[in-house]
Amino acid sequence: MDPVATHSCHLLQQLHEQRIQGLLCDCMLVVKGVCFKAHKNVLAAFSQYFRSLFQNSSSQKNDVFHLDVKNVSGIGQILDFMYTSHLDLNQDNIQVMLDTAQCLQVQNVLSLCHTFLKSATVVQPPGMPCNSTLSLQSTLTPDATCVISENYPPHLLQECSADAQQNKTLDESHPHASPSVNRHHSAGEISKQAPDTSDGSCTELPFKQPNYYYKLRNFYSKQYHKHAAGPSQERVVEQPFAFSTSTDLTTVESQPCAVSHSECILESPEHLPSNFLAQPVNDSAPHPESDATCQQPVKQMRLKKAIHLKKLNFLKSQKYAEQVSEPKSDDGLTKRLESASKNTLEKASSQSAEEKESEEVVSCENFNCISETERPEDPAALEDQSQTLQSQRQYACELCGKPFKHPSNLELHKRSHTGEKPFECNICGKHFSQAGNLQTHLRRHSGEKPYICEICGKRFAASGDVQRHIIIHSGEKPHLCDICGRGFSNFSNLKEHKKTHTADKVFTCDECGKSFNMQRKLVKHRIRHTGERPYSCSACGKCFGGSGDLRRHVRTHTGEKPYTCEICNKCFTRSAVLRRHKKMHCKAGDESPDVLEELSQAIETSDLEKSQSSDSFSQDTSVTLMPVSVKLPVHPVENSVAEFDSHSGGSYCKLRSMIQPHGVSDQEKLSLDPGKLAKPQMQQTQPQAYAYSDVDTPAGGEPLQADGMAMIRSSLAALDNHGGDPLGSRASSTTYRNSEGQFFSSMTLWGLAMKTLQNENELDQ
């Protein structure tokens, strides 16, 4: 190979591997939430759109570009084409690829799409089905132009090219030698059509496109490196393509026919002529010398389509086996095979033994086509064959019996039983059972997060993390704990939570012997012994042992309070504080109806312990008339505080306004009693003429009874025991307010005032 071509192939191969691993990529394309990493130089080299985009956004920092492309697979295939020169075009994706290439202005892809569309609109022969031309030339069309040039060593390429030129000369001199297109028609149509007509139909194919589009393809493609040492059976698959390139028509114009012939075997039986099923793949040998010359390089030839062809052929053969398993179709198929075998035996006799053997391997083993040598004789054989094909679809595990459709999936499943983890991280030494898990793990070391949440813009290293994260925005918690009923957004968190209910503590600390039921708790505990604090705050430099501790600390700088109380809308920085706060709401709601009941019980208890005389009541009159500005200590219950401020304050104002006009007469009466002279004038009471009807009555409207009197006596005694200082000094001191007893409701204070007035009347008598 040319040194320049080798150098360019190696360069593009390395760039492609870097893109797959996500290394040294300087831009990211986001299409509907799916991220594609690539190199700007490669994108700009193939696309005029990307070239202008990168030049105009040179000052952009993040290098993330959101593309308005309708189909995600279109951009993915175009990126693969840029790095591998490989593009799969078929009837399903041709329109998508054409639209995407026009949007991104990729001229090479546009040329390939137009060439594909031209080949699909070729004038068909009379007997050909309408969809046969397009289907036969669609899947492997791009490979046809590079079949000769891309896989051979230089000396073999020269030899094959010389043979091809010789074949071209022979074909021009003998136009009736190779009617390769006639094999696509029925036996009756072959007899009616002239041989030069078939040649003309094949030469009219406008499929002459340059080879330089595909010369670099297999040198660095994944399949080339992955299956370079594959079994010989896969190599035989490409032999029909190679035989046709050297035998059919001209060098360039025969290649579409060869590809179409190989694809024709993949078609379902109803679209194929009757004589085609039993006919060998290459039943015509226009020139024996050309076959012998190119047979050697054919065996070394490898097409990238081999894997896809085998999979598609297998599915087609299954469908065919199911159809021919019916009795009616069995008879018809046998008749067609017998009639077709008569026409093909004469052609097959001219071939050598080696050619026959290779053709049988290709037609029977790889393409699963029923040839003349393997034609079933009875319906029972067809049924056995269909059962064999059905059994091949399932690969069962020997240990648990779980079925799989592909052996590779079965191989991965077996590792779950054996515990084999062949993939090792070269950074931390952790092992994985699958290569994809290792690749995701490596992103955590490099910090790469290619997956983005479309709602909040948060980035993740794995696609599964995005799916689990999206549930947070919806607030849905479908996974419930069957023990405590707590809900979780994903199953892994629920599984971790269930370990808290188990009493088994299998994780033990080696240093102190403390056990834990979860491994993460043990890891966090070990940090206390080592003193390691790997997480540091970028704002203040403080270090922490866990990442969660660092996140909570950062909230002190940002002021973020993500946890909100649903009752009072108060926000908190930690979820534990929110849970304690919610318990306060529940406790307050349970205790508020029982406040008065607790107070009444306390008053009755104190009444039984103490019995007061009339003299004690006269001594306790000093606490009855407090200034309006003095307030009793506030109880934690807010409802009681409001009741005291609104109701009792008005009662005291009314009492003072009625007592003050009688101060002079009361002073004369108190002068007769030396024990009363020491009391201040503020404590003087009104005479007997006081009208009870002017004082506010309780809500019930009933006067105080004997039970109310007992309650008042105990309350006054409790107030008197707090100290012997005058009321004025006690009211103004902070210590007195802090050491004050229970809070009394407004009804109790009203009762105290009424009893004081009654005691004064008794003293006057």
UniProtKB/Swiss-Prot annotation:
**Domain annotation BTB: ranges:** 25-91
Region (Disordered) residue ranges read 165-203, 275-294
Question: Where do the zinc-finger regions (C2H2-type) map?
Answer: 395-417, 423-445, 451-473, 479-501, 507-529, 535-557, 563-585
Q: Does the keyword Metal-binding apply?
A: yes
**A single GO BP annotation from the record?**
positive regulation of transcription by RNA polymerase II
Q: Which Pfam families match?
A: BTB, zf-C2H2, zf-C2H2_6
Judging by the UniProt lineage, the source's domain of life is Eukaryota
Sorted keywords for this record are: Activator, Cell cycle, Cytoplasm, DNA-binding, Metal-binding, Nucleus, Repeat, Transcription, Transcription regulation, Zinc, Zinc-finger
Xref: InterPro entries: BTB/POZ_dom, SKP1/BTB/POZ_sf, Znf_C2H2_sf, Znf_C2H2_type, ZnFinger_BTB_dom_contain
Q: In which tissues is it expressed?
A: Highly expressed in normal epidermis and in other epithelial tissues, including in colon and lung. Tends to be down-regulated in colon, lung and skin cancer tissues.
- Membrane-crossing segments per the record: none
Q: Which GO terms describe its molecular function?
A: DNA-binding transcription factor binding; DNA-binding transcription repressor activity, RNA polymerase II-specific; RNA polymerase II cis-regulatory region sequence-specific DNA binding; sequence-specific DNA binding; transcription coactivator binding; zinc ion binding
Cellular component aspect of the GO annotation = cytoplasm; cytosol; microtubule cytoskeleton; nucleoplasm; nucleus
Entry-linked Gene3D superfamilies: Classic Zinc Finger, Potassium Channel Kv1.1, Chain A
Query: What is the induction note for this entry?
Result: Induced by the DNA-damaging agent etoposide. This induction is mediated by TP53 at the transcriptional level.
Q: Which family does it belong to?
A: Belongs to the krueppel C2H2-type zinc-finger protein family.
**What is known about its subunit structure?**
Isoform 1 interacts with EP300 and KAT5/Tip60. The interaction with EP300 is direct and leads to synergistic induction of CDKN1A. On the CDKN1A promoter, forms a complex with ZBTB17/Miz-1; this interaction leads to additive CDKN1A transactivation. Isoform 3 also interacts with ZBTB17; this interaction may block ZBTB17 repressor activity.
Q: What is its biological role?
A: Transcription factor. Inhibits cell proliferation by activating either CDKN1A/p21 transcription or RB1 transcription.
Q: What is this protein called?
A: Zinc finger and BTB domain-containing protein 49
Specify the species: Homo sapiens (Human)
Gene designation = ZBTB49
